[in-house]
């Protein structure tokens, strides 16, 4: 079991209020991602759940037990940090087994758990190597293996892919997702990368200044952002946000339209503009178009659409894809 409940959780460092008041339910077996900009409180929230930071007020429940004052070792959670934190003088096998040896577990049970974790993570052939002989991705798998052998109620990941290059990050995203599908254990994952959040999560928690802006599935947040912050944060490239007379036509203070929901033409359309920068990615091209009275608009089109700097184009937003926001920033 790995159900985690937070009720009116607050965190203060002296006079600084990092998390004002927060309520959240994480169901057993869910893959939940905390995402937000730097300083939004996502890592602090994870550390509160882990017990590495004390709660200033409120309650944390793990599987129906009040864990607010419970020491980290008693919570039944396993954490994987951004840095691998492996012992360089120990073999992979000894690194994975370390928490079990510290718990004075029977040698036969340690062997069983280490062997099982190594199979899951494709580390069986590397058990006798030391961390210095491994790639970055393999080292991160060893760190995950050290968490798996504890057979926790939930896994806590604190930006575990930040130290890896782009190709390894893609591979590890897939491996962690497959691991979740295999173990069916609750996972809470912290990242500032909304691509990781969108591709891995069952449920995303968008945080801003210690407050939850929105909770939902990746597609729910993408299709129905609750406010301007979520609209501008979720999606890459980010949503185009337009104020002024064009927004007023739609009865809103601000309207939003995603780059792929703007139709592009060389002949006619709602808005005439001039192509500034073109980003050619092969399958897609992102055009940054200057339209009078608006911010520069980003348009996503096919990779074969040939336009150049200075070309005149016409843009038409798809009417059913326009998002409307009021003066308070909330979706209408």
UniProtKB/Swiss-Prot annotation:
Keywords: ATP-binding, Nucleotide-binding, Transport. The keyword Transmembrane helix does not apply. ATP binds at residues 36-43. SMART domains: AAA. InterPro entries: AAA+_ATPase (IPR003593), ABC_transporter-like_ATP-bd (IPR003439), ABC_transporter-like_CS (IPR017871), ABC_transpr_MalK-like (IPR015855), ABC_transpr_MalK/UgpC-like (IPR047641), Mo/tungstate-bd_C_term_dom (IPR008995), NA-bd_OB-fold (IPR012340), P-loop_NTPase (IPR027417). It comes from the Bacteria. Residues 4-234 form the ABC transporter domain. PROSITE patterns: ABC_TRANSPORTER_1, ABC_TRANSPORTER_2. It holds the Pfam family ABC_tran. GO terms for molecular function: ABC-type maltose transporter activity; ATP binding; ATP hydrolysis activity. One of its GO terms (cellular component) is ATP-binding cassette (ABC) transporter complex, substrate-binding subunit-containing. Belongs to the ABC transporter superfamily. This is ATP-binding transport protein SmoK. It comes from Cereibacter sphaeroides (Rhodobacter sphaeroides). The gene is smoK.
